[in-house]
Amino acid sequence: MARITNMGKRKRFLEATPYESKVLEQPKNSSNTNEESSSQDNMKASFGSSKRYDERQKKKRSEYRRLRRINQRNRDKFCFACRQQGHIVQDCPEAKDNVSICFRCGSKEHSLNACSKKGPLKFAKCFICHENGHLSGQCEQNPKGLYPKGGCCKFCSSVHHLAKDCDQVNKDDVSFGHVVGVAGTTGADEDVYHEYAKTVAAPTKKRPVKPVKKLVTF
């Protein structure tokens, strides 16, 4: 059996054309986007700088308040050695050589309050008359005596001793009363007023003696 085919011309395909790349065009609103991004960056930078500025201001205010509290505490202090405000005896520049020793016996192991001996203060130096043998509180040239902030003994108006050490008060007729002090006004060297109230001995009432019953026996 024979087969007949159509023997036509051979089909030809088109040749491939070369690929041409085109440059992408930028959108028209690209300038707007750049402006928006730059404005956002500026806002972030300004916000960060303002935040840092606020933190610096807070630190400055905190430091100012701290220094103000220190100055307030120093104003309330009073030195019993040089009679000046702003420091206490332990920090006094004029009394640095003598504060660490006992004014009575000269020992460096204890202070005057802990000394067991009795006698004059040989190692003490007065900061008013600059003489040895007494403290500035007992100096006759000191008008304030033991009361650097003012005041006197409540019984004899003397400034050379405290009210509890006054000789005009007979301790046999005096009972220890309550301690009177104003909070916030007394300093480390200020005398706190010890009030001793005189008590009048009230007559004691005698109880009536009951008569003893007598037993009569028959």
Swiss-Prot record:
Listed Low complexity bias regions: 29-39
GO molecular function per UniProt: nucleic acid binding; zinc ion binding
Chain spans, region Disordered: 1-67
Disulfide bond positions: none
Domain of life of the organism encoding this protein: Eukaryota
Biased composition (Polar residues): 40-49
Pfam families tied to this protein: zf-CCHC
GO CC, any one term: nucleolus
Listed Basic residues bias regions: 58-67
Keyword annotations from UniProtKB, A to Z: Metal-binding, Repeat, Zinc, Zinc-finger
Keyword Zinc-finger: yes
First and last residues of each zinc finger (CCHC-type): 77-94, 100-117, 124-141, 152-168
Protein name: Uncharacterized protein C683.02c
Organism: Schizosaccharomyces pombe (strain 972 / ATCC 24843) (Fission yeast)
